[in-house]
Regions:
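Polytopic transmembrane helical bundles with strong interfacial aromatic enrichment
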Residues: 1-161
């Protein structure tokens, strides 16, 4: 294989795997957000409130990107028996992303008003619910890969192997 062919294959594989690559960053950031927010609620003077804002914003941007890439990557499976299983995963993913977008908007408004809600129990509850939705998204996404072989090379259901 020439380096041009290898590069072309690498680019094609990366585009095909984009969703799988993108999902792990927002998962890590938003789960960490839940832990740090709990710490801030328990220790209000910890100085970590700004850290939770950064985790929320970057994690939410990543979640939106991962959700969009997931919607795009599911199109080849529209007419397959796996469509229902994929829709279940999509529902959890869209719900988690929507909740974190709403939390980001809520917190942004509260910060502009000079009273950051990021250290409140109510904000922690919202983040905890979002983390639960994110966990369900991850579990159903894992099922797609490990139980159904979605996007696993050599076992791709679209190829009949």
């Amino acid at each position: 294989m020439t380096w041009e062919n290898a590069l072309g294959k690498l680019i094609a594989d990366t585009i095909e795997d984009l969703h799988s690559i993108m999902v792990h960053f927002p998962i890590a950031l938003l789960v960490l957000l839940a832990a740090v927010t709990a710490y801030v609620v328990l220790r209000p003077g910890s100085g970590m409130l700004q850290t939770t804002w950064l985790l929320l914003v970057v994690g939410t941007i990543g979640a939106v990107a991962a959700t969009v890439s997931g919607v795009v990557s599911h199109f080849p499976y529209e007419e397959t028996d796996l469509h229902g299983v994929i829709e279940n995963h999509q529902w959890w993913s869209v719900a988690a992303t929507a909740l974190f977008v709403a939390a980001t908007i809520w917190r942004s408004i509260s910060r502009r008003r000079g009273s950051d809600c990021g250290g409140s129990v109510s904000f922690l509850v919202v983040v905890a619910v979002g983390t639960g939705l994110l966990a369900m998204s991850g579990l159903t996404g894992g099922d797609l890969v490990f139980d159904h072989g979605i996007n696993v090379r050599g076992v791709n259901p679209l190829l009949g192997r």
